[in-house]
Amino acid sequence: VKSLIEYSNDLNVMVIPDMDFPSHSKAFLSLIKQNDKSLYQEIISDYSDNTLDFFSNRKAVDVTNRQIDEITELFKQPQFAEQQRIVLGGDEVAGGGAHQNSFIEYMNQIGDYAFQQGYEPQMWNDMVTHEGVKSLNNHYSILYWKQNEDNKSNLTVEDFDKYYFDVYNYNYYSLYFLPSKQFSQDDINEQAEYIGWAYAYNKFYYNKNPYNEVNSQNVKGSALSFWGEHATDMTQEELINQEVPLIKAYFNLKK
């Protein structure tokens, strides 16, 4: 990671660390379980073994903040002081919708801590309800991957704008790709062509239209995401051969 940061500094490129709390944390929690079973039992959620307990659990918050502290220090880039961002997660949280107050309280606590380290915290959109957004700390910016189908949490980009949240487009269709050995070069070329017509920085995934154009001042950018769950058996060369054509397609169109 240090070599990556040094290389990025030479190119004047800001690196955004991406973590995921309180859910999608099974690997992190497994390490804690191996080293301190007592602590593990105190911070594990009753809902899922990949989720930290977000119900006013001070120890769970402290453990999260220690991880944030380690990552923010590791990724620090002085030339981007007060501009750096960190993704803290907040997506697909078991119980997060039904217990929105506790979920938002947890996200506010860890977001405040990241902000104190000089980073802008970011979180995914899907677990925030129409009530929850009212108390979510504005330190956060929102990564919008798709509109939730639940009426309680189907906020649009415009809804987030009403509460002064900046939003980044992570469209679940046009800006997602999962590299895999099953894809041929023709498949990659087809995906690159798809990005060419489907992507625009303001085309968001809404339930009735995955390419819904949004004209709102709070749209601050977009990102192309690669997810690695199908790529564990791929070499670095194979990964690069699939990803680079899509990256080129994305940047050629980015405004």
Predicted features along the sequence, with ranges:
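Active-site-proximal loop/turn and secondary-structure-junction residues that shape catalytic pockets
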Residues: 19-25, 92-94, 127-129, 146-148, ...
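Flexible, acidic glycine-rich loops studded with aromatic residues
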Residues: 133-255
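Structural preference for beta-strand elements that scaffold enzyme active sites
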Residues: 12-16, 51, 83-87, 120-122, ...
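Alpha-helical scaffolding within the catalytic cores
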Residues: 33-34, 66-73, 127-129, 151-156, ...
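C-terminal domain-boundary segment and adjacent tail
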Residues: 115, 120-122, 255
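N-terminal active-site wall of soluble small-molecule enzyme domains
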Residues: 107-109, 131-135
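Substrate-binding cleft of carbohydrate-active enzyme catalytic domains
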Residues: 1-117
